[in-house]
Amino acid sequence: MFLGTHPVRLDDKNRFVLPAKFRGMLDSVVLTRGQERCLYLFDRSEFERISDGIRNTALSQKKVRDYLRIFLSGAAAQLPDRQHRIVIANHLRAYADLKKEVTVIGAGKHVEIWDSEAWSSYLEEQEAAFSEIAEEVIPGLI
């Protein structure tokens, strides 16, 4: 399971170093567009499981086709290099409006990559409602 918040920097080639805690879990990865203008980083097998699930839904529904196109067309499969770096393609960097300072967060079965300022704003906004939404999202679990 991916956990935690890790500030990192993009180098001049749009690369960042994977946090040490994630390295053993991410040998082959897929990077794609995420929700709220962040990027999702999946282990390749998890990405295949999710994309299979999406592809097995009713392609007769326009919203399913639209989502599938956006989700898969931006995806980039790769292997981290020997220094554990991941390259962010230009179209993905533009989508998430990533600057030099980025934040890598563990989100359970995947990793999210945020522009650090955007992450701080999102976190500040969402933390205020965190306890209030618990009853709706996870009733009786905690």
Curated annotation (Swiss-Prot):
HAMAP family: MraZ. GO terms for biological process: negative regulation of DNA-templated transcription initiation. This is Transcriptional regulator MraZ. Belongs to the MraZ family. Keywords: Cytoplasm, DNA-binding, Repeat, Transcription, Transcription regulation. Gene3D superfamilies: Transcriptional regulator MraZ domain. Forms oligomers. It comes from Tropheryma whipplei (strain Twist). It holds the Pfam family MraZ.
